[in-house]
Amino acid sequence: MSPIEKSSKLENVCYDIRGPVLKEAKRLEEEGNKVLKLNIGNPAPFGFEAPDEILVDVIRNLPTAQGYCDSKGLYSARKAIMQHYQARGMRDVTVEDIYIGNGVSELIVQAMQALLNSGDEMLVPAPDYPLWTAAVSLSSGKAVHYLCDESSDWFPDLDDIRAKITPRTRGIVIINPNNPTGAVYSKELLMEIVNIAREHNLIIFADEIYDKILYDDAEHHSIAALAPDLLTITFNGLSKTYRVAGFRQGWMVLNGPKKHAKGYIEGLEMLASMRLCANVPAQHAIQTALGGYQSISEFILPGARLYEQRNRAWELINDIPGVSCVKPRGALYMFPRIDAKRFNIHDDQKMVLDFLLQEKVLLVQGTAFNWPWPDHFRIVTLPREDDLEMAINRFGRFLSGYHQ
């Protein structure tokens, strides 16, 4: 019998956050080892529970949530999203401009599949959240990575963006606040990106899932509000700010001129209809979440868990000889640099695998985020301070005797 192979469409599709190193971690757990997983931004397992009123509203609406809904989502949920963005300066957004999906991840794939033809290019940051690159590849497109500058607080390199635009470039992806670096972009920088998109007729895809997880004096600006004359698609959801990642509730919002994008919108509607609708019971969480008390503020202020965990992790990482890290101003991650020459590191996946096997702590290598050099890794700052201290101290101990 001939072997059954995966489709050739998947040859260039990678998502190493849940890749080979995670498989090895699962093997270790099956053997009875306890593995501290710092690879996924999943708030609930680290004690960040959803607000009670969100859970109560979902439960109360279960009797009326047993059937399908509109393929774009419940009207009440989409109206709440519409009002949320109108209050943030996107005054022309209507209910019909909003698509609710089974998490932002599903919508990213739909947005790329509806747009890209073979060989079309999409500008994606390096480092990025790797689903963006994977979705472009799955959609027969080519992800062209523009560099973000570590020496400039991980802001995008505007000259590199300009240099990588070609006649095949269809759009640009902006992840703000950024995963994995924690950068929060200034209004001035966003306006520069808007000007580039305007000059080259690019669609802007704005991943803003961490827009309320901000530290110190960081301020988030929605790029769509700065570019009312450009087609911008904004992605957000409940997973991070409202701590219900398992509910799989995300949305995308179309803003700007849409008449010239009629064909693209028809494609989005077709793909939305093909999967019938998003999870209906969980959609009842959206109106309550957006309209109620924003409890995330209890975790991001000085003295609160996320704030103090970020500070402690940053201090400990920078105390390790040969390791440095730009202090994140948003999101749930750090993206430290390792002196690759000092440790003779030429394969960062091997490094995190060796660390896992020795110390039973799971990290993600920097190249998994389409960073071109093997000199970074990502760590999640969701664990309590004592767990972060244990993990980072183990990493320092590991590096002290490590060479490839």
Which residue stretches match the model-derived regions?
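Helix C-cap/helix->beta junction micro-motif
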Residues: 28-31, 139, 199-200, 230, ...
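N-terminal small-domain helix-loop-helix segment of the aminotransferase-like
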Residues: 2-103, 110, 277, 289-293, ...
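PLP-dependent enzyme catalytic core of the Aspartate aminotransferase-like
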Residues: 87, 163, 344-350, 354-363, ...
